[in-house]
Amino acid sequence: MAFQDLLDQVGGLGRFQILQMVFLIMFNVIVYHQTQLENFAAFILDHRCWVHILDNDTIPDNDPGTLSQDALLRISIPFDSNLRPEKCRRFVHPQWKLIHLNGTFPNTSEPDTEPCVDGWVYDQSSFPSTIVTKWDLVCESQPLNSVAKFLFMAGMMVGGNLYGHLSDRFGRKFVLRWSYLQLAIVGTCAAFAPTILVYCSLRFLAGAATFSIIVNTVLLIVEWITHQFCAMALTLTLCAASIGHITLGSLAFVIRDQCILQLVMSAPCFVFFLFSRWLAESARWLIINNKPEEGLKELRKAAHRNGMKNAEDILTMEVLKSTMKQELEAAQKKHSLCELLRIPNICKRICFLSFVRFASTIPFWGLTLHLQHLGNNVFLLQTLFGAVTLLANCVAPWALNHMSRRLSQMLLMFLLATCLLAIIFVPQEMQTLRVVLATLGVGAASLGITCSTAQENELIPSIIRGRATGITGNFANIGGALASLMMILSIYSRPLPWIIYGVFAILSGLVVLLLPETRNQPLLDSIQDVENEGVNSLAAPQRSSVL
């Protein structure tokens, strides 16, 4: 008897599974806030140098009380080509001759300027406090803003590897509960971090815990339901991410202080940690790891909650042992990474899929992590991005059932590249058009990544699917980490990061054409199925999986 058949007897999607799924997805909505928290906590406010004549509160009316604030600003701060005050320079001495001029120096030499040696003054009308104002992450220190985002994404990459291994060894529930506690502690501490170094270190740990929670949530949901409900469950977890992004925009609009926002995002994880004690461990994991008594206990609990009255009679150790035999035989058929890469077709597929995930993830995170570079209203952008990814997740099942995998991904990536490159030529004043292009690009990226994930599961045989997915997932996390660092290049050329994002989107759309088409093809079970692909392609079409 297969384990899926055993779950059918327990109840493939009964009250037990629904309650566990609802709790886990509700928790994930809050956890997903962490992935884009820096869009608000690290918002760069308008700023200028602190100058004695303007900002010294001990001098009543700024001493020369007959002059307006605008006049004092004109003689203290040089103006740029757009006639706006420079953000990182000030005059060494007040330029009184500029009072009756428009900030220019006709027929005269440029006066001496200096960096903002006394600090900065910020326009705090949008946010009273961010990590930028807390540690002056502007001008020469502005790249540290991107470093904070990079370290969070790097933490997600490390967490995927470390906690994935720990989850296989110590159980889904134990690692999930530990990750809730870790995120609660480091997130709360980050709100009161004394230095940017401490803050970045805590955000790295928060990234590791966040990715661990996301992965183990999916595992606990999928390993408790039968195969026919997996696609629906995964779609719901993706929708939870979108809802999390929408609610983040709303919460950040209400809570403008960085410290309070950090606390609101992190403190609920203490509650999640306490409530998670009532979650059920994966019975599949318990059985495979030689804990049949505990596995049987969890199965009987699930059966009782699903309304099965004679669970003890049906779910016996003899039945469980027959299930264990098949599951353990499948678990023992493992291949090392070197063995996988020595198989030409497997190696080629893993390499191409890894690049596609890497190249498609870069522009997605490039858009979603840098809202301030796209428009002035970051709250609206955050909400729109969440809404369009939610729509993409709802459209994904239809697209997967009616469109070619390769063609759909190519068109979506080309649409994404078009939006990214078009943003370069749209001036900042045309906010509506920039928002429309960015939102359309995020929708295309989200739908393209979903299609890529489905094709990945259809191209890799079941026996090595978990290991191969781990490899491609690492490349996706690397892409997300690099996307945040690439924005540092905007210091040298504002269009350069968007050009790079667009190029990667185009490359992703081209490389996917090198992969076989998998729509209406049966899922592969063994490596031999891949080697015999030419023969299998002649078989009658079967319904494809959306997993």
From Swiss-Prot:
Name its cellular compartments: Membrane
* Protein keywords: Glycoprotein, Membrane, Transmembrane, Transmembrane helix, Transport
The tissues where this chain's protein is expressed are given as: Expressed exclusively in liver in both embryo and adult.
Q: Name one Pfam family in it.
A: MFS_1
Membrane topology (Extracellular): 31-145, 199-204, 256-259, 371-377, 428-434, 492-494
Tell me a GO cellular component. Answer: membrane
Q: Which residues lie on this side of the membrane: Cytoplasmic?
A: 1-9, 167-177, 226-234, 281-349, 399-406, 456-470, 516-547
The source's superkingdom equals Eukaryota
Q: Does the keyword Transmembrane helix apply?
A: yes
Question: What stretches pass through the bilayer?
Answer: 10-30, 146-166, 178-198, 205-225, 235-255, 260-280, 350-370, 378-398, 407-427, 435-455, 471-491, 495-515
| Membrane topology recorded in Swiss-Prot or TrEMBL | Multi-pass membrane protein
Q: Could you give a single Gene Ontology term from the biological process aspect? A: organic anion transport
Q: What's a single GO MF annotation on this record?
A: transmembrane transporter activity
Q: Which InterPro entries match?
A: MFS, MFS_dom, MFS_trans_sf
Which residues are glycosylated according to the annotation? N56, N102
The family assignment reads: Belongs to the major facilitator (TC 2.A.1) superfamily. Organic cation transporter (TC 2.A.1.19) family.
Q: Which PANTHER family match?
A: SOLUTE CARRIER FAMILY 22 MEMBER
Q: What is the protein's name according to its record?
A: Solute carrier family 22 member 25
Organism, scientific name = Homo sapiens (Human)
